UniProtKB/Swiss-Prot annotation:
PROSITE patterns attached to this UniProt entry: ADENYLATE_KINASE (PS00113)
CDD domains: ADK
Similarity remark: Belongs to the adenylate kinase family.
Protein name: Adenylate kinase
Organism per entry: Bacteroides thetaiotaomicron (strain ATCC 29148 / DSM 2079 / JCM 5827 / CCUG 10774 / NCTC 10582 / VPI-5482 / E50)
Function: Catalyzes the reversible transfer of the terminal phosphate group between ATP and AMP. Plays an important role in cellular energy homeostasis and in adenine nucleotide metabolism.
Pfam families: ADK
Keyword NADP: no
Entries under NCBIfam families matching the protein: PRK00279.1-3, PRK14527.1, PRK14528.1, PRK14531.1, PRK14532.1
Length: 189
C-alpha cells in the first residue's frame, strides 16, 4: 500500500498536486480539514467530541485526530494507498501516525515536501485571496500562517529525513513539471 504524506507551506500547491496524485495512482486522499468537517456533519461520536473542542476554541488533541484518521484509513482497506494532506504537523503527530500505521502492518512510504520560497508563497496566496475572496489570504494573516508553518515544520522535516522517508520537491515551475518530479519520486518506491 502506498502511503504518502504531502507537505508544504500554504500556497505550495499541495491541494493541486494531491488531486493529480490521487488520479494517477488510484489512491485515496485524506485531508484533515475535510475529514473533521465530515465527522462533525455526520454526527459520529468522534465528530461530536471534536466539535466540543472546536466550539470551545481549543485545538483537537493528537490522540483524537489519530482516532479520526484511523477510522477513515480503515474505511479504505481495499485501497491502493492514501495521501495524507494536512497531517502530521508536529513530531508527536508523525510518531502517532507511524504507530497507527504500524498497527495495521503499514508505514509511510514517502513524505513529499513541496518547497516554495516565501516571496513566491506570498504572491500566490495574495492572488488566491483576491481570486477566491478568502478572508484568511490577506498579507498580515499570510505572514502569520507562514511563520507558524515554518516554526512547526523544521523539526518534522528532520524527523522524516531520519526515517529515510523525506523527498524534497521543487515547488517552483509549471504544475506539470512539479508533478513529473513527484511521479519520479513515487515511481521509485
Amino acid at each position: 500500500m502506498l502511503n504518502i504524506v504531502i507537505f508544504g507551506a500554504p500556497g505550495s500547491g499541495k491541494g493541486t498536486q494531491s488531486e493529480r496524485i490521487v488520479e494517477k495512482y488510484g489512491i485515496n486522499h485524506i485531508s484533515t480539514g475535510d475529514v473533521l468537517r465530515a465527522e462533525i456533519k455526520n454526527g459520529t461520536e468522534l465528530g461530536k467530541t471534536a466539535k466540543g473542542y472546536i466550539d470551545q476554541g481549543q485545538l483537537i488533541p493528537d490522540e483524537l485526530m489519530i482516532d479520526i484518521l484511523a477510522s477513515v484509513f480503515d474505511s479504505f482497506k481495499d485501497s491502493k494507498g492514501v495521501i495524507f494532506d494536512g497531517f502530521p504537523r508536529t513530531i508527536a503527530q508523525a510518531e502517532a501516525l507511524k504507530k497507527m500505521l504500524a498497527e495495521r502492518g503499514q508505514d509511510v512510504s514517502v513524505m513529499l515536501d513541496l518547497e516554495v520560497p516565501e516571496d513566491e508563497l506570498m504572491v500566490r496566496l495574495i492572488k488566491r485571496g483576491k481570486d477566491s475572496g478568502r478572508a484568511d489570504d490577506n498579507e498580515e494573516t499570510i505572514k502569520k500562517r507562514l511563520h507558524v508553518y515554518h516554526s512547526q515544520t523544521s523539526p518534522l522535516i528532520d524527523w522524516y529525513k531520519n526515517e529515510k522517508k523525506y523527498q524534497h520537491i521543487n515547488g517552483l515551475g509549471t504544475m506539470d513539471g512539479i508533478f513529473a518530479d513527484i511521479c519520479e519520486a513515487v515511481d521509485k518506491l
